[in-house]
């Protein structure tokens, strides 16, 4: 009887873990509803920039664990620039990817960051970022980091870094610069655990502006 009871308890302990493992093992395409009102701004291409990934003409298929959902909708956003030049920080998580004024927030020139508080730690699947809708906007020193520490002093994981000369002070990045588009940038969350997502930039190859249209954080709650 004791052996049977022990086996039953062991089974009950293992089952939730198995369910979670099965859920994470099955991968499905990430669902993103892209803006249908995207405008391609007629900016001239910047000069003297390193090789970069050109703007895609169609959305990428990115696989994530089954059960992944949008975690960042309506979540609070803070920034190294508490008083943006244009717009308000809540535009970053309002679910609106449309281009143009009234849809983006613009920070001061120079190195800046925005930070999303998910409310609690979660297992991250993907982070999607839209600065602007333009094939000739190539943002500089883009770094995406995750932590459970709101001050990012400990337990920090870097998921993306294209700061090739380490000028941002966050380490030398190996990711490529990329051109903006209505399909944004999808960063692999790698199953990292974290509550806070911080995104850095240092203007773009054309000007000093730091604009953010939308950020989506997808994961397993």
What is each PLM-predicted segment?
Residues 15-17:
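C-terminal motif of bacterial Sec signal peptides marking the signal peptidase cleavage site
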Residues 60-96:
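Predominantly extracellular/luminal regions of secreted and cell-surface proteins
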Residues 7-13:
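Bacterial N-terminal signal peptides
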Residues 22-42, 80, 106-112, 134-221:
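Trp- and acidic/polar-enriched beta-sheet ligand-binding modules for extracellular glycan
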Residues 21-68:
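N-terminal pre-domain segments of enzymes
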Residues 77, 123-134, 199:
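A short beta-strand element within beta-rich, extracytoplasmic domains
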Residues 1-4:
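Positively charged n-region of N-terminal signal peptides that target proteins for export
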Residues 111, 119-126, 194-195:
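Extended extracellular/luminal ectodomain segments enriched in beta-structured repeat modules
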């Amino acid at each position: 009887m004791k052996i049977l009871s022990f086996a039953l308890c062991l089974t009950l302990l293992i089952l939730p873990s198995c369910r979670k493992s099965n859920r994470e093992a099955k991968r499905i395409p990430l669902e993103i509803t892209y803006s249908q009102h995207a405008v391609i701004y007629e900016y001239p291409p910047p000069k003297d920039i390193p090789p970069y990934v050109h703007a895609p003409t169609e959305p990428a298929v990115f696989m994530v664990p089954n059960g992944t959902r949008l975690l960042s909708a309506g979540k609070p956003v803070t920034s190294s620039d508490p008083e943006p030049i244009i717009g308000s920080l809540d535009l970053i998580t309002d679910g609106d990817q449309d281009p143009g004024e009234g849809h983006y927030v613009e920070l001061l020139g120079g190195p800046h960051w925005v930070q999303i508080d998910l409310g609690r730690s979660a297992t991250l699947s993907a982070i999607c970022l839209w600065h602007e809708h333009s094939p000739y906007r190539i943002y500089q020193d883009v770094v995406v980091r995750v932590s459970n520490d709101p001050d990012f002093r400990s337990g920090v994981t870097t998921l993306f870094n294209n700061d090739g000369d380490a000028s941002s002070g966050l380490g030398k990045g190996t990711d490529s610069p990329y051109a903006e588009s209505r399909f944004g940038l999808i960063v692999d969350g790698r199953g990292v655990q974290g509550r806070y997502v911080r995104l850095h930039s240092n203007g773009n190859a054309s000007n000093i502006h730091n604009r953010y249209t939308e950020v989506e954080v997808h994961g397993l709650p």
